[in-house]
Amino acid sequence: MTKSYSESGLMGEPQPQGPPSWTDECLSSQDEEHEADKKEDELEAMNAEEDSLRNGGEEEDEDEDLEEEEEEEEEEDDQKPKRRGPKKKKMTKARLERFKLRRMKANARERNRMHGLNAALDNLRKVVPCYSKTQKLSKIETLRLAKNYIWALSEILRSGKSPDLVSFVQTLCKGLSQPTTNLVAGCLQLNPRTFLPEQNPDMPPHLPTASASFPVHPYSYQSPGLPSPPYGTMDSSHVFHVKPPPHAYSAALEPFFESPLTDCTSPSFDGPLSPPLSINGNFSFKHEPSTEFEKNYAFTMHYPAATLAGPQSHGSIFSSGAAAPRCEIPIDNIMSFDSHSHHERVMSAQLNAIFHD
């Protein structure tokens, strides 16, 4: 049978709602998440805008400063010629302090290096055979003399023979200046003209280079590598320095004496040689003044009249009115003139004592 209207109307009436389904819950949760994301995005955008505003102001200030600096540099470049290469950095206070600190350290290093070098050169000056209280060897002369000294000693050790003094001194003075050569000669108690024949072109060829007018004194320089007993064993005050007779050797031996020889105006014997005297860098040997031979005449004896109270026989000889007599002692009766043999004996004795003990 057919249904009634009432029944069909009941179908169109709203039915009571039941509990929400799981789909509704999912949709609501998604909406909440979308809203939270939107809020976060809005906050981030606001923060970014604020940062951009702040940074924009700073960047604008920096840009303005850079533009001003560029304008100043352009003005300076217009005034000054352009320099090639890297541009010089602006000197700040920190860079200036670092620069000063580096310079101070470099100066201290250089000062210490020079102090060490000078101390080493002073020690070397004490070792080389050249010493003077008034003069000081330069650095280059000290190194040259040390090189020559090492070479001479190595040659002696290699050959195993006692060297000739003249050749030894010539090796020491090779390449040195004249003042340094004079200092070495003064240390060895030699005259530079005796071992430098090239400085005397007028010297006769038959004469030896070493003359007896300047005999070799004992080698007073003490070296750490050589024995000490031979040095200073001879006393120069006991050695007579005999000059040759003027009439026989005056012209030939004039180059070897400090002053030219004159006829019978100097005594036959001179006192010992004093240490070399330095005058403007030139060393020369000077005889010490002797009270016995100060006069031009030799061995003159004066007797005052007050002390001659004796017999009449003596009074006739030593009278007060008469001139003082001259008592000359011949040289031949005292010592024969054997200059070269004496010089060679002294050299050989000293060298043998040094290198064979």
From Swiss-Prot:
Compositional bias (Acidic residues): 58-78
GO molecular function, one term: DNA-binding transcription factor activity, RNA polymerase II-specific
One GO process term, biological-process aspect: endocrine pancreas development
Family matches, as InterPro entries: bHLH_dom (IPR011598), bHLH_transcription_factors (IPR050359), HLH_DNA-bd_sf (IPR036638), NeuroD_DUF (IPR022575), TF_bHLH_NeuroD (IPR016637)
One Pfam family this sequence matches: Neuro_bHLH
Region named Disordered: 1-94
GO cellular component: cytoplasm; nucleus; RNA polymerase II transcription regulator complex
PANTHER family, sorted: BASIC HELIX-LOOP-HELIX PROTEIN NEUROGENIN-RELATED (PTHR19290), NEUROGENIC DIFFERENTIATION FACTOR 1 (PTHR19290:SF88)
Quaternary structure and interacting proteins, as annotated: Efficient DNA-binding requires dimerization with another bHLH protein. Heterodimer with TCF3/E47; the heterodimer is inhibited in presence of ID2, but not NR0B2, to E-box element. Interacts with EP300; the interaction is inhibited by NR0B2. Interacts with RREB1. Interacts with ATOH8.
Protein name listed in UniProt: Neurogenic differentiation factor 1
Organism of provenance: Rattus norvegicus (Rat)
Gene name in the database record: Neurod1
